[in-house]
């Protein structure tokens, strides 16, 4: 219970609350949550995608590679990078592995590659189905890659990754319940009411349990895996996080800017 000092007006309380909500890096944008004994950081973007951006290269045509450089670039424009995370898997030169659209410009085409059978474990990006998160005229959506391509969508921003975690409220059937293949993982979901929600595990988790987080806890009928292990980094200064990639940097990066 909070006791108010005599003389503090209701108007002053309302003003203080408004100012608190307007603070950059506010903690209600990202928070720590626990689901089935696994700890996560959950971040919410605005339903219409306002403030959500994709970053890859700076004005010198060089990959940003880390969150601090994006935060510095935002600050130079008088803006604040509230949170950021890896936006999907990438090549050794930090280029996106699949479709990448930034500010309406397609900088990388969609990947339709299927690995040759018997050539070893299938990389996560190519596990079926992989998918595309995009922001278009009708808002944000996540679709399996083949469905996205058939619809010939022209998005404002888009990134391709894989595999899909949840498809039309069903967990991807390739995932194994109780799998011992556990690592830190990151993903994005389109959730109840059209909310855009990001999740990064702070503990090791398998694919099935990570997908279950999106479907059952975050209420996301469609969700996409972004990256795992050293690639599952996040920037949330309000929570004391500014991760560094184990791979020398990140490729495409989601950033929420105010």
Predicted feature residues:
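Bacterial N-terminal signal peptides that target proteins for export
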Residues: 1-11
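Bacterial N-terminal signal peptides
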Residues: 10-19
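Zymogen propeptides
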Residues: 21-124
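Short, solvent-exposed aromatic-acidic interface loops
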Residues: 57-62, 146-151, 201-204
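Short, surface-exposed beta-edge/turn micro-motifs
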Residues: 80-81, 128-131, 162, 184-186, ...
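Active-site-adjacent helix-turn-beta-strand microarchitecture at beta-sheet edges
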Residues: 95-175
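Conserved, well-ordered active-site substructure
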Residues: 97-113, 118-119, 174-223, 231-258
């Amino acid at each position: 219970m909070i006791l108010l000092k005599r003389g503090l007006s209701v108007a002053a309380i309302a003003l203080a609350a408004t100012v608190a909500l307007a603070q950059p890096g506010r903690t209600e944008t990202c928070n720590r949550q626990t689901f089935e004994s696994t700890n996560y950081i959950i971040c919410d973007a605005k339903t219409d995608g306002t403030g959500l951006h994709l970053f890859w290269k700076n004005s010198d045509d060089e990959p940003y590679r880390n969150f601090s450089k994006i935060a510095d670039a935002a600050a130079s424009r008088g803006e604040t990078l509230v949170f950021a995370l890896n936006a999907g898997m990438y090549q050794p030169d930090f280029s996106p592995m699949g479709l990448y659209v930034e500010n309406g410009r397609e900088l990388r085409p969609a990947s339709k590659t299927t690995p040759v059978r018997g050539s070893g474990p299938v990389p996560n990006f190519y596990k079926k189905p992989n998918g595309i998160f995009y922001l278009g005229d009708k808002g944000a959506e996540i679709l399996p890659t083949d469905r996205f391509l058939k619809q010939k969508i022209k998005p404002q921003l888009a990134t391709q990754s894989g595999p899909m975690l949840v498809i039309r409220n069903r967990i991807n059937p390739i995932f194994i319940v109780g799998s011992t293949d556990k690592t830190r993982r990151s993903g994005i979901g389109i959730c109840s009411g059209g909310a855009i929600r990001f999740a990064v595990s702070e503990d090791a988790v398998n694919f099935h349990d990570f997908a279950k987080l999106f479907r059952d806890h975050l209420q996301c009928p469609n969700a996409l895996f972004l990256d795992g292990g050293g690639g599952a980094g996040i920037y949330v200064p309000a929570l004391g996080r500014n991760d560094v990639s184990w791979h020398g940097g990140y490729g495409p990066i989601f950033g929420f800017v105010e």
